[in-house]
Amino acid sequence: MRLIPSLAAIIIATPALADPKVIADLPPVHSLVAQVMEGVGTPTLLLDQGGSGHSLSLRPSQASAAQEADLIFWIGPAMSPALEKPFETLGENAHVIALMTAPGTLIIDTADSEPHTHDGEEGHDHEDHAEEGHDHDHDHEEHAEEGHDHDHDEHAEEGHDHDHDKHAEEGHDDDHAAHAEEAHDDQDHDHAEDGHDHHDHGPEDPHVWLSPENAKTWLALIAEELAEHDPDNAATYESNAKAAIANIDTLTAQIETTLAPFEGREYLATHRAFAYFEARFHLAPAQALTGIDGGAAGPRAMEEVREAAEDGITCLITEPETKEATVATLTEGTALEAHFLDPLGRDIAPGPQQYTQLLQNIAATYADCLK
């Protein structure tokens, strides 16, 4: 009889395992993580008060939360360079995953329009991926400093090989052998001369979340990482990831139907942020106007608008960062219709449905602009 209260005391004194503390950098990433964690917990969003993902930095309260986090999912330094140093100095409990360098991630070079994978693997079977996981080794004690050690021999989409050792600190080397998709092989866009860049993105376009294929790859990875830190809920993470992947497949088919009539139709953009979306849905690469970086439209941009008008182009895709006065100047006296799009979906409520709504909004805006 004496053992019973002793056992009860032991049970009472044993703390229950807390739900993993998870942080995501941008609203679309947060949405994907939230989908996988649904029914278990809620991730924390860093970009929670507007602003730009390119200039995202940690507030003191966020830095404290990051120190206590179990998992941090972010795009990587190509998108938010100010986060790299803080993430490198986090405590040993914080496991940082840069999604842009995750295996299987499709990458588009800023001087190109065709995606290639970020490794040399055979590709992902998204039906089985959440269950079977990635074919790569994790050293979780050193992941925040050294990243994943990936050894991938080949992949189905003929990308290029990456050495991912220490990618969180040192970046990665690319061997650009070939490109996966051929949706845009009829146009050559030299963005150093003909386009512009709101931000110095470097050699690779960081807007990787706008590829639904990348989202599916990441959902499986997110489930795997969560399961390793919280094995008691592994089945829930796996089931949620599979359901989210299936939903993206359904959404992708719907968007393909919506945008099929506009394949190859040309348009202008104040900033070429939607290359991944364009490539996946066979849209012509945007003709990015020169020198518009949130400021006034210069003579060259106006000349490009005039030439576009002569070619019968009537669609202009612009972003919230572009001033309304600039847009008015660009469209005045022309047949151009400006349509605003936010690649981050900051006008959409954060949560599990944000990513789906973001892609739906982009598709609807393109269809309306290109009609």
Regions found by a protein language model. Name each.
Residues 9-10:
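Terminal low-complexity/disordered tails
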Residues 1-5:
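Positively charged n-region of N-terminal signal peptides that target proteins for export
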Residues 19-371:
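Extracytoplasmic metal-acquisition and chelation regions
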Residues 13-17:
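N-terminal signal peptide c-region/cleavage motif recognized by signal peptidases
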